[in-house]
Amino acid sequence: MITPIIMAGGNGSRLWPLSRTLYPKQFLCLDGSQSMLQTTITRINNLNASDPIVICNEQHRFIVAEQLKELSKSSGDIILEPVGRNTAPAVALAALKCLKKNALLLVLAADHIIKDEETFCKTIQDARKYAEAGKLVTFGIVPTMPETGYGYIRRGQALFSAENDCSLAFRVAEFVEKPNLETAQSYLDSGEYYWNSGMFLFRADRYIEELKIRPDIYKACSLAMESAVTDLDFIRVDEDSFCACPDESIDYAVMEKTNDAVVVPLNAGWSDVGSWSSLWEISDKDSNGNVTKGDVLSHNADNCYLHAETGLVTAVGVKDLIVVQTKDAVLVANTNCVQDVKKIVEKIKLENRHEHITHREVYRPWGKYDSIDFGERYQVKRITVKPGEGISEQQHYHRAEHWIIVAGTAKITIKGEVKILTENESVYIPVGVKHCLENPGKIALELIEVRSGAYLGEDDIVRFSDKYGRN
């Protein structure tokens, strides 16, 4: 049986301001009602595959668990990377976990869009016989334009199956770096090159066998998995061992070295959604070529991407623009300059701002909060707690809190005294007092929190107990 390995790391900074460090693009709903991670998992339902193994950053663990839960998928196989070490070590962790099962690993990125899912699944099935025979299969995207933003794979000798004389796969002749425009055009004209998708299919044992040509990676990952511990839904690998691992991609560490690399062409409407212009290209457009999301009005606007998260966005007499509005930031960019969005993100970092890290609305394992106003000595939040969930037992040294219940029922414990509050009731929590909040009801609990004090940072917290295992 195929075991999907979903690579859910990365921060997608080219899609700022929607994509942030703590809520990157793979968790966003960009092309429908599901997040990109959820769409990636749903896409392989017809493959009769096992539940996926998701590899993600420590900071994203609760987002991944919640999105898997929404799909009714098991969340028991979420491998947490203490640091990012690229794709070769990440896949090694999953392969080591699956080694005894002799699993066939389908390695997928969580942030790709594939329009023709039927063709995608058929191509996976066609490639299966090569992977089962011990080949390391990579999927090459049939190019549609001389793209300079992707690496390429040059195909070599055709491989013919016993069933027919029509080749479905080729030996990999070479992997090539991102070309200039002239070279990319020559690749397109030759018909021998494919875009490097970063998707793979191989047996777990074959990957580990080939990885041993890099004993530094193999040893570090083996030690990391040998000392791994299970925490709630998560597999925490040993931090010291994994941090010692080199940062290396699968292509460099394995695929360029092996004699068994095979490329299977894939023509299924693939996109890695690497920029706002690529998202515009794959999205439905109006008669003027505009893509609109949210509350948007336009007049004499052409070929624009207009996104309104809150409030009204209007565009008049403009063309070839990207306009993305969120609760705390607005991006306006020419479609020809979208690769430079990363430079704006770097400027935000240099100015020690926070807009590249988190949205105004922040998700937690118990629910979410929205910072709706703040000043020098106060902050106002709208807090939503899911049924059956609650915040940790905690105290703060520098701030007091006022909670006003807007909807639902709150079970509040202050200095050991339990109170049940409902709509239009409130409570005051003094500085330094131990307290906790739970939602015992069947509907979401909504409240307004007003903080006041000399220091209002999220790190002013001492947790005494926490059901989510946070420090």
Swiss-Prot record:
Entry EC no(s): 2.7.7.13
Class of the enzyme per the UniProt entry, highest EC level: transferase
GO MF term set: GTP binding; mannose-1-phosphate guanylyltransferase (GTP) activity
Transmembrane spans: none
InterPro entries cross-referenced by the UniProt entry: EF_Hand_1_Ca_BS, GMPP_N, Man1P_GuaTrfase/Man6P_Isoase, Man6P_isomerase-2_C, ManC/GMP-like_b-helix, Mannose-6P_isomerase_type2, NTP_transferase_dom, Nucleotide-diphossugar_trans
GO BP, one annotated term: lipopolysaccharide biosynthetic process
Keywords: GTP-binding, Lipopolysaccharide biosynthesis, Nucleotide-binding, Nucleotidyltransferase, Transferase
Catalytic activity annotation: alpha-D-mannose 1-phosphate + GTP + H(+) = GDP-alpha-D-mannose + diphosphate
Pathway involvement of the protein, from the record: Nucleotide-sugar biosynthesis; GDP-alpha-D-mannose biosynthesis; GDP-alpha-D-mannose from alpha-D-mannose 1-phosphate (GTP route): step 1/1
Pfam families in the record: ManC_GMP_beta-helix, MannoseP_isomer, NTP_transferase
Functional note: Involved in GDP-mannose biosynthesis which serves as the activated sugar nucleotide precursor for mannose residues in cell surface polysaccharides. This enzyme participates in synthesis of the LPS O antigen.
Family from the record: Belongs to the mannose-6-phosphate isomerase type 2 family.
Designated name of the protein: Mannose-1-phosphate guanylyltransferase
Species for this entry: Salmonella montevideo
Lineage: Bacteria, Pseudomonadati, Pseudomonadota, Gammaproteobacteria, Enterobacterales
